[in-house]
């Protein structure tokens, strides 16, 4: 069982299923969790953030709160990054912290980028030597998650 789980979340609703999955993963052991959220900047030159620092910190604080309420030791981390560097930052921060496992969302993206493996989840899976667990989408039943978890 992992003792340090690095959980990467974004601002979309999928973060709730990622946090719930990480909570179940950590609940039965003395696992600690670090929740990571990157403030993504898009564009060229003077890139614009997709959200404010306050919005990003609120996303992380909410996730940490839910983990702590479930009895899981948790802390959060927010870092600015360019959209194309998010996967590298996830892997680098997880390694820097000494994580055993990285948890990412399982939401299916759209378009050719997902099919060709250009999504953040796919790039984390390719880049990391750590165990990477993909949280199932919210519509998957809790019983199935427990069986496969």
Show the residue positions of the predicted features.
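Charged docking surfaces used in two-component/phosphorelay signaling
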Residues: 79-89
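Intrinsically disordered or low-complexity boundary/linker segments at protein termini
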Residues: 1-17, 126-149
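Acidic, proline/glycine-rich short linear motifs
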Residues: 28, 35-62, 142-149
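Small/aliphatic-rich secondary-structure junction motif
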Residues: 1-49, 72-75
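Glycine-rich, Arg-bearing micro-motifs that act as flexible, cationic patches
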Residues: 101-127, 137, 141-146
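Glycine-rich phosphate-binding loop signature in dinucleotide/nucleotide-binding domains
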Residues: 93-100
């Amino acid at each position: 069982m992992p003792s340090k789980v690095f959980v990467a979340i974004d601002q979309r609703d999928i973060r709730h299923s990622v946090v719930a999955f990480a909570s179940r993963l950590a609940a039965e052991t003395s696992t600690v969790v670090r929740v990571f959220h990157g403030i993504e900047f898009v564009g060229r030159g003077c890139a614009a953030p997709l959200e404010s620092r306050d919005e990003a910190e609120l996303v992380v604080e909410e996730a940490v709160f839910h983990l702590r309420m479930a009895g899981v030791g948790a802390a959060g981390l927010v870092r600015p990054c360019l959209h194309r560097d998010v996967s590298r930052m996830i892997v680098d921060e997880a390694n820097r912290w000494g994580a055993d496992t990285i948890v990412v969302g399982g939401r299916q993206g759209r378009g050719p980028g997902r099919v060709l493996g250009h999504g953040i989840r796919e790039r984390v899976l390719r880049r990391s030597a750590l165990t990477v667990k993909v949280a199932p989408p919210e519509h998957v039943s809790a019983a199935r998650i427990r069986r496969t978890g």
